[in-house]
């Protein structure tokens, strides 16, 4: 009897010790991109890597293609506690901290090199910290989303070619700057609804990076790929403040390291894909690829950068432009 009692006590003690090790927290990572895109591929990698580095204590479930809501919804979900991690564009994050929108303004960057240095700069780090202090959610990494181009059923060589065009834009204020400045009619439509809107001719055109145009199959319902190159875009990986604050310091380091590595890997994939797709839209998909007059477009936006729609001041603008 005594021996049985000792065995029981040992079993209870073993379970008590095993409890914390076996405890697992499931986290939701939401985004609006397709499963075939680099962002999703490396989010899945990050989920596996975080599970390994935390000895299975955290399991990330990745929800792609707007399955947990539109981009506006998942941004709100960070604060509501319905999602734990998201990818989002600067314009959406700027609803919380407006100066952050500067990196998503049309023709803000001279080229990819300028964007890359900005993405690694103290300027962006300060803006991310401002976002964190304002809303409590933690930006931990940035991924190159690509250069946004304009698809339509006609050639767009110069800004005047866009006058009166019904252009779908994401539902965030900054994206209105592009159509407004060139005389197009901005039509905000949720990402998941864009293909149908183009097919039904609810809108005439849309704008996105080449990898996204391919992944979302927008080329199926548009004849021209116009290389306007108007926005060099990034996605921000943001962890909900509620989730971030529960992590130990060691786990915070693990999460941040993995998410930054995933962002770097996705960036490499997007850069390679952009280069390849310029030719493939013509040769593989038989689309008309138009090399728009980017200099003419950029000239139109000089005043807009410090106009009434800018959510940043001249001092910040000058710092961004001074990055070499």
List each language-model region with its residue ranges.
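N-terminal secretory/targeting leader peptides
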Residues: 24-114, 123, 130-324
